[in-house]
Amino acid sequence: MELKWPKFISVVVDDMEKQRRFYRDILGFREAESSEQWVDFRLPGGYLELLKRDASPQRSSKRFQVGFTVDDIHAAREELMRRGVESISEIEGDEPGSKNLWCHFRDAEGNVFEITQWLKNPEG
């Protein structure tokens, strides 16, 4: 298993529209995709993702998370769990049209990180 350079950083926000305006209008980031729960801004080599705070274990108490790209998410998840890394979600994103699969873990101090396997080119 090889964890590759972070492809994204997620920032958990309480006021999505306020943060969206800040990153888009003040910092000049280009908005790529969005929903009511998240906004992606494309950056060279990756993206910044704003996530609306909710009751999920991944977002309830932390303000950010890092996502690492892997080639085979099933093998990577199995290996991380074998190494004693705490898994806090099953593999998600396995729906028709999905661009990626992902799952979440906690590091030694409880910080959340994600591993992602891209099914389609994340740039387009």
Predicted features and spans:
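N-terminal beta-strand motif that seeds the catalytic metal site of vicinal oxygen chelate
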Residues: 1-18, 47, 64-66, 119-124
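Core segments of cupin and vicinal oxygen chelate
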Residues: 10-48
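Short, positively charged
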Residues: 19-21, 79-87
